[in-house]
Regions:
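Intrinsically disordered, low-complexity, charge-rich segments with an acidic bias
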Residues: 10-41, 52-59
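Nucleotide-activated chemistry modules centered on ATP-dependent adenylation/adenylyltransferase
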Residues: 59-325
Length: 325
């Protein structure tokens, strides 16, 4: 039986192909090990309700894509985070029959289990519609290694750590001044892959930023802005096509990493309520950070709040209040 996933794991030196995505929270023995025939066991698309393409139609579409690709002077690349905006971008580009050569996703290792399941469904949808799979980039060591174990190499950084009296290893909690998580786990990997692609062809890099987030736009392609698709519209497009993100957007403002220090207090309250195991893991990470980096910025999860402090606050909120007559 042929593996129906093939992803690219990239570090700074080489590109390594893997036949399975290393998702701890997803059953690898189900959707990842499917045959070509399993994509066409129904006569319709269960996500859109539309009639499915036959094997012959998919083969013909692939051949046409190859022909179109060879005739075009650029690669059409979609940056898929998996959130509502980038998912809506992918859906609309498919529906508008715009060229899509490569869809890349940078996995920060700390997504919600529901997000990994969502990406599985999006990958199946992409394969059915365009005959390609998501290409996933991963840092070879991951978030926790970067947070606690990455050795400091620059003499200035080492000297500063010595003066602070903290560990010479790890970056601590990400902060507004040093948001190393996004840089190391997403931007750096994606930029390196885009630069590699540019050695072959010109690249049109499409990013899913909504029309009401126009301040984030710089020099790349932002179709949602051009089409006037707001965040609310993007989410509705996803819902209309059967992508509900496992209910994440009903509990959280953004479906970002579950350990993100930039979450709202209300989101952290919901993390404790709806994902108690992740909350427990976050408490352990925060305790380790305090022991390794102290009470300074590196060891502080959120300004004015530690996870232990939030645990006490949330527990206090749950206690029944005495109502006086």
């Amino acid at each position: 039986m042929e593996k129906c996933r093939e992803y690219v794991c990239k570090d700074n030196k080489n590109v390594q192909k893997k036949s399975n995505y290393e998702w701890d929270k997803v059953d690898k023995n189900t959707t990842n090990n499917c045959s070509k025939e399993s994509h066409n066991q129904w006569g319709y698309n269960p996500i859109t309700g539309e009639e499915k393409k036959s094997d012959e139609e998919i083969k013909s579409a692939k051949q046409q894509d190859k022909k179109d690709f060879s005739e075009r002077d650029s690669l059409s690349v979609i940056n898929l985070s998996g959130g509502k905006d980038s998912t809506a971008l992918l859906i609309l580009m498919i529906e508008k029959e715009l060229p899509i050569d490569i869809v890349i996703n940078a996995d920060p290792w700390m997504e919600f289990p529901e997000m990994y399941e969502h990406l599985e469904r999006v990958d199946e949808y992409l394969y059915r519609e365009r005959g390609i799979h998501i290409t996933t980039l991963r840092h070879p060591k991951g978030f926790e290694w970067l947070m606690f174990e990455e050795p400091k190499k620059r003499s200035s950084a080492i000297q500063k750590r010595i003066e602070m009296g903290v560990s010479l290893y790890g970056n601590g909690w990400p902060g507004f001044k040093v948001r190393w998580c996004t840089g190391q786990l997403k931007i750096k990997l994606i930029d390196a892959e885009i630069q590699r692609m540019k050695t072959e062809k010109r690249v049109l890099h499409h990013i899913g930023i909504a029309a009401d987030e126009v301040q984030r736009c710089k020099e790349k392609q932002y179709p949602l802005v051009e089409w006037g698709i707001t965040e609310a519209k993007a989410l509705q497009i996803c819902y209309d096509h059967g992508f509900d993100f496992g209910g994440l957007y009903k509990k959280y403002h953004r479906a970002s990493c579950w350990c993100c220090p930039f979450q709202r207090i209300s989101e952290l309250r919901n993390l404790r309520k709806y994902h108690p195991q992740l909350w427990k893991q976050l408490m352990e990470m925060d305790q380790r950070a305090k022991e390794q980096f102290g009470s300074g910025a590196l060891g502080q999860f959120k300004q004015r709040w530690s996870i232990e402090g939030l645990e006490n606050r949330f527990a206090q909120e749950e206690k029944p209040r005495l109502i006086l007559p």
